[in-house]
Amino acid sequence: MLDKRDYTLIIDKSGSMSNTDRGTNKSRWEIVKESTLALARKCDQLDPDGITVYLFSGKFKRYDNVSAVKVEQIFQENDPMGGTNLTAVLQDAINQFFQRKKAGQAKGGETILVITDGEPDDRRSVFEVIIEATKKMNSDAELAISFIQVGSDASATDFLKALDDKLQSIGANFDIVDTITLADMEDMTLAEVLLSAIND
């Protein structure tokens, strides 16, 4: 559970995150903000170090030791704009984990939660980054990456399904990716999905 793992949240802040989907009265960005707050509050109780939060579009920014209070500030400082360059941010998060592991500072393992609404601009290199990471791992418990889709973009769903199904067939040593599309969420809110991901 939480006290045995480190958690990193990677949030898409590309321009389309300001869209509002049918059946909701909030933008994707607002929904993600509320859900991140719920997750941070839960983590505040369980892990006093806070969580690591990244925001990415064309470039990315990392925030360490994030508490619920800091989440508010992060979302105030950022507005959705730009593209979806997922490779650089994912590479940084994975590198951080391996650096901590090497220094003996990693807990039992790391879970990276990626919240995105579109297919990344760099689909192929996202696969490569994840496959490379699995080659440095000794067991599949060390690192888990969950991709969670917000919105209903069909190409995003297709990309996530490919990540979930094809990694090992194209060279990954372990299947470390789990994906949750909008359909998988059914009646769960994004906050509930995030909380269930850390309870696994």
Tell what function each PLM region has.
Residues M1-D200:
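Acidic, low-complexity intrinsically disordered regions
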